[in-house]
Amino acid sequence: MVDHLKRQDEKVFAAIEAELGRQRSKIELIASENFVSEAVMEAQGSVLTNKYAEGYPGKRYYGGCEHVDVVEDIARDRVKEIFGAEHVNVQPHSGAQANMAVYFTILEQGDTVLGMNLSHGGHLTHGSPVNFSGVQYNFVEYGVDAESHRINYDDVLAKAKEHKPKLIVAGASAYPRVIDFKRFREIADEVGAYLMVDMAHIAGLVAAGLHPNPVPHAHFVTTTTHKTLRGPRGGMILCEEQFAKQIDKSIFPGIQGGPLMHVIAAKAVAFGEALQDDFKTYAQNIINNANRLAEGLQKEGLTLVSGGTDNHLILIDVRNLEITGKVAEHVLDEVGITVNKNTIPFETASPFVTSGVRIGTAAVTSRGFGLEEMDEIASLIAYTLKNHENEAALEEARKRVEALTSKFPMYTDL
């Protein structure tokens, strides 16, 4: 297939080859990224990309859907087996659209929702004023404690009692600690609210039984299918059976047309991988690597938000190094370490500058990195940030990155 692309469109082929080279040669620490299997990529690049399939298995608006029906049913059944969900919709094109569908199912414009502050670890779709969620609905924010940088559940309860939200959103995009979903449901029940959990970042850890499962506690659970779940880029919704018809209607015809059946096939393959015994080993290694990396960074004198991690994610506060998150992201990329600048709790800098850097261990763990490599990465990050204006030091860091990545070849058949 790549040979056809190379012959037909040299420019696109060259860009893809360059990206493959980047992924092979750099240390990927963006917490929301991962490396899918060749099987997942083959499914996504299959002839299913040709098929329109508006509707759901057995109830399509197009003919010729008998085979894509099988694929979608496989995907849904596997998710139910993994997470114990009563109903699953695997059609959302993204996590944002999954969240939108839940909002459209139970909220009216202007309804009050309680969600996590973006700079404290939340997500754009949890009420940011620049996102549809913050425009359409009246979001009230909760956050983390100023000292511990952990969610203060008493504060969440107090705000829930004060504002009487119709929906409470739990889950985060930059929160390195375990979230108490049972406590969130108790709070929701106390004020008569629905509970939605966005488990996008931790879905793979939940699938492996290494993080509390929100499904028994939440009315709705949304997630992406990539990140720690190691599938293609996409979303899905898990919910109680009582909301099944409403959720499905919110996705189609509510906010989407035809589903991307080639992506759903890739999702099904990834879900099958998540059911294998070695996936639990993989997820445990993600956590082990994150803990080791956090310890190494702290030994190097770096400050971590909340003092460490319980999952795959680490948030570094770079202010004591007298640099910004923007500078840190740039200089690390210069030596071959890919991260993203990120706001930290009680942020004072612009979101385009930030005081933090977010990193994660899902992708490097997929590549085969272990504890020794985490020690080297911690050393590399600290060395690079402390010497960010020293070109000789940066050149040394580049060589160390190259030495590390060369030991772990990836996608050798591509």
Curated annotation (Swiss-Prot):
- Cellular component terms, GO, for this chain's entry? cytosol
> Where in the cell is the protein located?
Cytoplasm
Q: Which reaction does it catalyse?
A: (6R)-5,10-methylene-5,6,7,8-tetrahydrofolate + glycine + H2O = (6S)-5,6,7,8-tetrahydrofolate + L-serine
Which residues are modified to N6-(pyridoxal phosphate)lysine? 227
Which Pfam families does this chain map to?
SHMT
**Pathway entry:** One-carbon metabolism; tetrahydrofolate interconversion; Amino-acid biosynthesis; glycine biosynthesis; glycine from L-serine: step 1/1
Report the EC code(s) recorded for this entry: 2.1.2.1
Show the GO MF annotations.
glycine hydroxymethyltransferase activity; pyridoxal phosphate binding
Asked if Ligase is a keyword of the record, the answer is no
What class does this enzyme belong to in the EC scheme?
transferase
Cofactor(s) listed in the protein's UniProt record: pyridoxal 5'-phosphate
Q: Which UniProt keywords apply?
A: Amino-acid biosynthesis, Cytoplasm, One-carbon metabolism, Pyridoxal phosphate, Transferase
Q: Where does (6S)-5,6,7,8-tetrahydrofolate bind?
A: 118, 122-124, 240, 350-352
Keyword Transferase in annotation: yes
Provide the site residues for: Plays an important role in substrate specificity.
226
Task: Name its GO BP terms in alphabetical order.
Answer: glycine biosynthetic process from serine; tetrahydrofolate interconversion
What is the annotated quaternary arrangement, including any partners? Homodimer.
What HAMAP family does the record point to?
SHMT
Q: What does this protein do?
A: Catalyzes the reversible interconversion of serine and glycine with tetrahydrofolate (THF) serving as the one-carbon carrier. This reaction serves as the major source of one-carbon groups required for the biosynthesis of purines, thymidylate, methionine, and other important biomolecules. Also exhibits THF-independent aldolase activity toward beta-hydroxyamino acids, producing glycine and aldehydes, via a retro-aldol mechanism.
Per the similarity annotation, which family is this?
Answer: Belongs to the SHMT family.
Its recorded name reads Serine hydroxymethyltransferase
In its UniProt entry, the species of origin is given as: Bacillus cereus (strain ZK / E33L)
